[in-house]
């Protein structure tokens, strides 16, 4: 039974960050309270009806490898699955799925309700309770105190949220939900650096008024991909297509004529928006020579009448939105059933956080999701999982954990945020990861599941399946190395005839698989192949490890060199003013950021190689003193 006032961890907000945070802490055995304005909105897909995409899918796979629920939820609710960048190398291939919004929410709700150690309550938090520079609980609007050892703030766009449609604006966390004004005001009274960001969403269109004839159709890939390492194609609901249309000169002219009604271009809206998901107004202004822009028509569900026109996010007045929609092929007679809008909200400087996502200023207070300056469900969920597990560790007085840049995209994300900060909504891309060949979708479990097991995040069924996959990979890779093909065998004739490979000496199956034109299924047609494996995940892993072995080895060597700096810690330095030779600018930045290692210090903007050399010399001198 719960003591209804005392918990180990309290999570404020039940979006993608909050739900993953609550799941992580409760799985680790902590009594967890999840507070939300509406239980009916648990894990809601507030904007686009999709999970994954370039770089984002890698985060989803990592969440799954650590026992999180996002991948499972989309497997049970995804109505169209595709592999992006399928013609490119495995490092940048990314899974993306359209979601049935209702099914997704219901799946998340079902998972949460089955979770032990978790209590979900409807309540709005208006204040935090502090004691000796530590957070010890929260106060709700109805004047109830809840106490805990740590608190995770995952409030999304609700802190000081303000919706803009044309030149009109009003307070809201998202359309139909009120903003968390009191908590926003209270947090601004603390010593936290806070600023404003904005994001936007397109109008929703009645599917019954769309003319899909003559539009480009996009079906699911065949075979249909699966997100979770525990997933199966049989988990997917019915698959339906999306459609592609375009804006045109008429659309662009309508927008140009009405820019004086845009809150973005009239100065009403100050917050910066996401660079990689701009409004249609931004596209027209920034790319005046473009004749058209893509618009993907994405159904919001199998039983929903809403269509999400991906590509025309806007905050123009509703009457202008109607003109824009009517100018687009296939939407000439369409009806808008919910207007597009921009929303402005508070975010807190992530440079004020440790790599565990705990505040440097307030012990036990963790931040996750959009309030850290990120955009996207996947970025939020991955932060939520990390904040939740570290809140749990903090409540047990145990040292926190975070992945390095060479271990996970999540490591890249938190290092970028806490080291460099952000002035615009941060979105994950594969290009942000310098070790992306080692951080593929297919090996997320091999990178993280053992760590998740030690942390208490991974259950027995996942652990058993993971170990079976590892065994399959090791056994088959050894078999392929031992299995040889003679240049005078029938298989050699097949290789010459079908693949133009002329064997002049005996070759192993493993060496043969290194050839770019040979796939694992090609080996299966050879007489000497004998019996292989049927585990498709293991097969994909084997192919990638063998084909890219040389590149992976070089990257591993680079990572080893990089780890020397990451493992050279700066915790012994309390005041950088005392180190001779550092410029005042460098001293200020180092004192402000308080990097944990030479590696992190080197990634701070303005920290020069010369400054790094001075720090290394200082550490060497201090080490020498201690040996005397």
From Swiss-Prot:
One of its GO terms (molecular function) is flavin adenine dinucleotide binding. This is tRNA uridine 5-carboxymethylaminomethyl modification enzyme MnmG. It holds the Pfam family GIDA. The keyword ATP-binding does not apply. It is found in: Cytoplasm. HAMAP family: MnmG_GidA (MF_00129). Its cofactor is FAD. InterPro entries: FAD/NAD-bd_sf, GIDA_C_N, MnmG, MnmG-rel, MnmG-rel_CS, MnmG_C, MnmG_C_subdom, MnmG_C_subdom_sf. SMART domains: GIDA_assoc_3. Keywords: Cytoplasm, FAD, Flavoprotein, NAD, tRNA processing. Belongs to the MnmG family. Its main location: cytoplasm. NAD(+) binds at residues 273-287. One of its GO terms (cellular component) is cytosol. GO terms for biological process: tRNA methylation; tRNA wobble uridine modification. FAD binds at residues 13-18. Homodimer. Heterotetramer of two MnmE and two MnmG subunits. The lineage of its organism: Bacteria, Pseudomonadati, Pseudomonadota, Gammaproteobacteria, Enterobacterales. The gene is mnmG. NAD-binding protein involved in the addition of a carboxymethylaminomethyl (cmnm) group at the wobble position (U34) of certain tRNAs, forming tRNA-cmnm(5)s(2)U34.
């Amino acid at each position: 039974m719960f003591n209804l006032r005392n918990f180990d961890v309290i999570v404020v907000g039940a979006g993608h960050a909050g739900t993953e945070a609550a799941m992580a802490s409760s799985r680790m055995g902590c009594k967890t309270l999840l507070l939300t304005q509406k239980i009916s909105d648990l894990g809601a897909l507030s904007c686009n009806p999709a999970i994954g995409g370039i770089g984002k899918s890698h985060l989803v796979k990592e969440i799954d490898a650590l026992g999180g629920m996002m991948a499972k939820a989309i497997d049970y609710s995804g109505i169209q699955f595709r592999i992006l960048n399928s013609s490119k190398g495995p490092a940048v291939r990314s899974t993306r799925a359209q979601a049935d919004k209702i099914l997704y929410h219901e799946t998340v709700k079902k998972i949460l309700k089955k979770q032990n150690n978790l209590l979900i309550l409807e309540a709005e938090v208006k204040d935090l309770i502090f004691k000796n520079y530590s957070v010890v609980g929260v106060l709700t609007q109805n004047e109830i105190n809840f106490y805990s050892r740590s608190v995770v703030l995952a409030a999304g766009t609700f802190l000081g949220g303000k919706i803009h449609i044309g030149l009109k604006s009003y307070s809201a966390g998202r359309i139909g939900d009120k903003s968390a004004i009191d908590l926003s005001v209270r947090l601004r009274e603390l010593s936290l650096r806070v600023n404003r960001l904005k994001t936007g969403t397109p109008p929703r269109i009645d599917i019954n008024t769309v003319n899909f004839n003559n539009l480009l159709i996009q079906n699911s890939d065949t075979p249909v991909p699966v997100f979770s390492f525990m997933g199966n194609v049989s988990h997917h609901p019915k698959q339906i297509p999306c459609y592609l249309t375009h804006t045109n000169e008429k659309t662009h002219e309508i927008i140009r004529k009405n820019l004086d009604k845009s809150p973005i271009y009239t100065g009403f809206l100050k917050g910066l928006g996401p660079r990689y998901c701009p409004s249609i107004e931004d596209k027209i202004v920034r790319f005046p020579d473009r004749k058209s822009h893509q618009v993907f028509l994405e159904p919001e569900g199998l039983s929903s009448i809403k269509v999400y026109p991906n590509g025309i996010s806007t905050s123009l007045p509703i009457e202008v939105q109607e003109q824009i929609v009517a100018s687009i092929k296939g939407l000439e007679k369409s009806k808008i059933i919910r207007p597009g809008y921009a929303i402005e909200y508070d975010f807190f400087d992530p440079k004020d956080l440790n790599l565990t996502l705990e505040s440097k200023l307030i012990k036990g207070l963790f931040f996750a999701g959009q309030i850290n300056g990120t955009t996207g469900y996947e970025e939020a969920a991955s932060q939520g999982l990390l904040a939740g597990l570290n809140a749990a560790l903090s409540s047990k007085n145990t040292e926190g954990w975070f992945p390095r840049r060479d271990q996970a995209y999540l490591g890249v994300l938190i290092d970028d945020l806490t080291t460099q900060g952000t002035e615009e909504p941060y979105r994950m891309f594969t290009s942000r990861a310098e070790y992306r060949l080692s951080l593929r979708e297919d090996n997320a479990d091999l990178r993280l599941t053992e760590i998740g097991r030690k942390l208490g995040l991974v259950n027995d069924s996942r652990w058993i399946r993971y170990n079976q996959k590892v065994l399959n990979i090791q056994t088959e890779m050894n078999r392929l190395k031992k299995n040889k093909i003679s240049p005078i065998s029938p298989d050699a004739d097949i290789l010459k005839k079908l693949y133009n490979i002329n064997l002049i000496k005996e070759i192993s199956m493993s060496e043969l698989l290194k050839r770019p034109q040979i796939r694992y299924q090609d080996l299966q047609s050879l007489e000497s192949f004998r019996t292989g494996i049927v585990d498709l995940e293991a097969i994909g892993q084997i192919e990638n490890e063998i084909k890219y072995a040389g590149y992976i080895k070089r990257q591993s060597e680079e990572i080893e060199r990089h780890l020397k700096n990451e493992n050279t810690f700066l915790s012994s330095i309390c005041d950088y003013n005392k180190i001779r030779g550092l410029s005042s600018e460098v001293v200020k930045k180092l004192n402000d950021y308080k990097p944990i290692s030479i590696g992190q210090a080197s990634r701070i903007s303005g920290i020069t190689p010369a400054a790094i050399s001075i720090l290394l010399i200082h550490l060497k001198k201090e080490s020498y003193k201690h040996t005397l």
